[in-house]
Amino acid sequence: VCISINEVVCHGIPDDGKLLKDGDIVNIDVTVIKDDFHGDTSKMFIVGKPTILGERLCRITQESLYLALKMVKPGINLRAIGAAIQKYVEAEGFSVVREYCGHGIGRGFHEEPQVLHYDSPETNVVLKPGMTFTIEPMVNAGKKEIRSMKDGWTVKTKDRSLSAQYEHTIVVTDNGCEILTLRKDDAIPAII
């Protein structure tokens, strides 16, 4: 479990001594292994009364994930999905982190392909039924640049702006995808 608060982009280390305050945005990222297969998901939570920026950032990040999920089907290039996420996020005045991405997942936690959340000519993977991977855009309220902390694990926004992330593990079906990590409060069907 990673718990990332406010400007922590990813890999936040849980800390019993850290008190949350009104308006904090918190990402909880959970990985499970069941029957030798991995699953990976994350979700944002807002503590108490949300700030306008915090609520908007979380909403736009989740919407960018849903937009991407609705695009998944055989024959689609992952580049188109990354480009759509980037276009949507940047049109809202936010930025997409470049150093971290979604990933293939199965018996191994990080497998091919890499799933970039921005447009890159180096992405040339065409989706096929049975492919299983995560989509997990990390979106910053400020600039896209990040920095690693001295603990060698935690990553924060360089400009100390807020960061949000939503993630699902999916499998490509014959005509769309199935969300393997769907939550009861998700506003999207399990099978798209």
Language model feature labels by segment:
Residues 1-192:
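Active-site neighborhoods and metal-handling regions in enzymes and metal-associated proteins
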